[in-house]
UniProtKB/Swiss-Prot annotation:
This is UPF0122 protein LCA_0713. It comes from Latilactobacillus sakei subsp. sakei (strain 23K) (Lactobacillus sakei subsp. sakei). Gene3D superfamilies: Winged helix-like DNA-binding domain superfamily/Winged helix DNA-binding domain. The lineage of its organism: Bacteria, Bacillati, Bacillota, Bacilli, Lactobacillales. Belongs to the UPF0122 family. Signal peptide: none annotated. InterPro entries: RNA_pol_sigma_r3/r4-like (IPR013324), UPF0122 (IPR007394), UPF0122_fam_protein (IPR054831), WH-like_DNA-bd_sf (IPR036388). Might take part in the signal recognition particle (SRP) pathway. This is inferred from the conservation of its genetic proximity to ftsY/ffh. May be a regulatory protein. It comes from the Bacteria.
Length: 113
């Protein structure tokens, strides 16, 4: 469960990190991105471990709130799933169609940007 939660927070951070304050951004970057402990972050910023914990939990709720309203991460996952399904279908049904393969590659490149 923790690994899935970490992956989700990293993804939400990628989508919504620019909307956070500098302190929120820094704490989450260190905690999830650089795998710092609460104690290490507290020492770095000369605050209590509890202050770091509270800030991180509050920021996680903020990120989840952004996702609940904007659905950017959910839409991204759905687009990727649809693109994967389309790619499998085209490869199975039209393996020799080079033009279709190129169009699909162009579409996949757009979804990755």
């Amino acid at each position: 469960m923790e690994l899935a939660q970490n992956a989700r927070m990293n993804s939400l951070f990628e989508f919504y990190g620019a909307l956070l304050t500098a302190k929120q951004h820094s704490y989450l970057s260190l905690y999830y991105g650089d795998d710092f402990s609460l104690g290490e972050i507290a020492e770095e910023y000369q605050v209590s471990r509890q202050a770091v914990y509270d800030n991180i939990r509050r920021t996680e709720k903020i990120l989840e709130g952004y996702e609940a309203k904007l659905h950017l991460f959910q839409n991204y996952e759905q687009q990727n799933a649809s693109a994967d399904a389309l790619q499998k279908y085209i490869q199975a049904q039209y393996p020799n169609d080079q033009q279709l393969a190129k169009l699909l590659a162009d579409l996949l490149n757009l979804t990755e940007q």
